[in-house]
Curated annotation (Swiss-Prot):
Keywords: Cytoplasm, Cytoplasmic vesicle, Cytoskeleton, Golgi apparatus, Protein transport, Transport. GO terms for cellular component: actin filament; clathrin-coated vesicle; endosome; Golgi apparatus; thylakoid; trans-Golgi network. This is Clathrin interactor EPSIN 1. Disruption phenotype: Defect in vacuolar trafficking. The gene is EPSIN1. Residues 526-536 have a biased composition (Low complexity). Residues 190-288, 414-453, 517-560 are annotated as: Disordered. It comes from Arabidopsis thaliana (Mouse-ear cress). A motif (Clathrin binding) lies at residues 296-300.
Length: 560
């Protein structure tokens, strides 16, 4: 049974859509058909109000009434069509147009015929009684004209009490009247009167608001003029009486002049006095008053600003000098440390005239001493190639009588290129040990070198050949391999130290230092003489500093 109800409802919906889309049934007619359908519930109140509103139009009124008369002709099982049509007619008598009421009265005979409507359902229930009762009530109402007027007046009163919007967006109001048309017209007139009254009230409110706003503006203008007058009056009074301004009074005047500008921003009217009073507020408290008599006080007031600007310039210049402070401090330390080393040279070598270099080299290595010390026990003298004037330590004392007046760039000038460029930038800390090295230079080494040199190079070709290693004069090479070749330096005796020094000398040549060949005999004699002098020297500090210098050059040889 439920399936049949669902099926019937679906069929009705399809039929309705076909009527609207295919058959082009008018919308109002379709609304009347929906209000008088075969559903087990009555028509909706909104649909009834729309139908009653449509009866006020002639064309739609005829359309609505034709559908209702068609529904009243139904019989039998379609009793719901008849019953719902009678419900719509009852609503139109109270709320419909006069035209609709007149047409309903004309069809009183058709409605009275429904008082004998009969239909009994299969279950034995008499459902025709609903139609009969409804038809009897409508016929009784139609026969009483006064009753119709009373019902219509009551409906109008209800509409005035409850105002709503229809589907077309029109507000419905009505007043009490004898006829429906009169009530509708009176309702519209009442609506117009309400509208006029509201518009007048709004206009009065707007005018009162404008008046109050103009009053506020007038008060604001008077306040602004009073403020500006008091400001100018106070200025004239200060110029005439005291002649000396204080910063507090100047700040007070600036605040007073700035106050009207903040108040004028809240309003839109133009005030020329307000704008003129805004201009002095842009200046500072230290501005010079051109109309005042005391200009000296103004200049005194403006003094701190000038000093602050000069201080800013001085700070800027100090910042520029501070950018180079790192370089200046380094050179000052080098010079100061060089002066200290010069005093040490005077203490240890006072018998010999020396020339010291006071200026520091541009490249100073402050951490080179930690790498140069190898071992304090290995006492190795300085090779001749390292003692050439090309690598003079800038902090060391150089003897004036070097090489006995001979040419310092003599026979072994070609070997000066054998020394690597590593020690040419000596460390500042290591220069203290180099100051004692001229003791071994000036005593024995230069004289014995010139006396015992068996071979003098007279030709530049021979010197170039010797420097390049094209001619090998080293016939007596050492036959024993030393541990220094491998890089092992330990606790060596005096004889082992000689071998280690020779090995370090040749290791420097093998690594590309280019120290030259054929110097083994010369180097050994030089080493023996230096060892004898060191043994004969009674001064302990001399032996200590010479050993430190030898250690430094030994480490330089290993680095090469």
């Amino acid at each position: 049974m439920d399936f049949m109800k669902v099926f019937d409802q679906t069929v009705r919906e399809i039929k309705r859509e076909v009527n609207l889309k295919v058959l082009k049934v008018p919308e109002m007619e379709q609304k009347v058909l929906d209000a008088t359908d075969n559903e087990p519930w009555g028509p909706h109140g909104t649909a009834l109000a729309e139908i009653a509103q449509a009866t006020k139009k002639f064309s739609e009124c005829q359309m609505v009434m034709s559908v209702l008369w068609t529904r009243l002709s139904e019989t039998g099982k379609d009793w719901r069509y008849v019953y719902k049509a009678l419900a719509v007619i009852d609503y139109l008598i109270s709320n419909g147009s006069e035209r609709a009421v007149d047409e309903i009265i004309e069809h009183t005979y058709q409605i009275s015929s429904l008082t004998s409507f009969e239909y009994v359902e299969p279950n034995g229930k008499d459902v025709g009684i609903n139609v009969r009762k409804k038809a009897e009530n409508i016929v009784a109402l139609l026969n009483n004209k006064e009753k119709i007027s009373e019902i219509r007046d009551k409906a109008v009163a209800n509409r005035n009490k409850y105002v709503g919007l229809s589907s077309t967006g029109i507000t419905y109001k009505s007043g009490s009247s004898a006829s429906f048309g009169g009530s509708f017209q009176s309702g519209s007139s009442n609506f117009d009167s309400y509208k006029d009254r509201d518009s007048r009230e709004d206009k009065n409110d707007y005018e009162s608001f404008q008046k109050s706003r103009r009053g506020v503006k007038t008060e604001e203008q008077s306040y602004t003029s009073k403020k500006s007058f008091s400001r100018y009056g106070s200025t004239d009074h200060d110029n005439l009486s005291s002649g000396k301004k204080s910063p507090d009074s100047a700040k007070h005047r600036s605040y007073v002049s700035a106050a009207p500008s903040n108040n004028d921003d809240d309003f839109d009217d133009f005030d020329p006095r307000g704008t003129s009073s805004n201009k002095p507020s842009t200046g500072s408290a230290n501005q010079v008053d051109l109309f005042g008599g005391d200009l000296i006080g103004d200049f005194l007031d403006s003094g701190p600003t000038e000093t602050s600007s000069t201080n800013n310039n001085e700070n800027f210049q100090e910042a520029d000098l501070f950018a180079d402070a790192a370089f200046v401090s380094a050179s000052a330390q080098g010079a100061e440390f060089g002066s200290q080393t010069q005093k040490q040279v005077d203490l240890f070598s006072a018998s010999e005239p020396s020339v010291t270099v006071s200026s520091a080299p541009p490249t100073v290595d402050l951490f080179a001493s930690s790498e140069s010390v190898v071992s304090p026990e290995a006492k190795i003298s300085i090779p001749e190639s390292m003692a050439t004037p090309n690598i003079v330590d800038p902090f060391a004392a150089v003897p004036m009588d070097n090489f006995d007046g001979s040419d310092p760039f003599g026979a072994f000038t070609s070997h000066s290129a054998s020394v690597s460029t590593g020690p040419q930038a000596p460390s500042v800390h290591g220069s203290a040990t180099n100051t004692t090295s001229p003791l071994s230079f000036a005593d024995s080494k230069p004289q014995h070198l010139q006396k015992k040199d068996p071979f003098q190079v007279k030709s530049g070709i021979w010197a170039d050949s010797l420097s390049r290693g094209l001619i090998d004069l080293n016939i007596t090479a050492p036959k024993k391999a030393s541990l220094a070749d491998v890089g092992v330096v330990g606790d060596l005796s005096n004889e082992d130290g000689n071998k280690a020094s020779a090995a370090s000398y040749y290791s420097g040549w093998s690594m590309g230092a280019g120290s030259g060949l054929g110097k083994t005999g010369l180097y050994s004699t030089q080493q023996q003489q230096q060892q004898q002098q060191q043994q004969q020297a009674p001064d302990i500090s001399d032996d200590f500093f010479s050993s430190l210098s030898n250690q430094r050059y030994q480490s330089g040889g290993f680095k090469q």
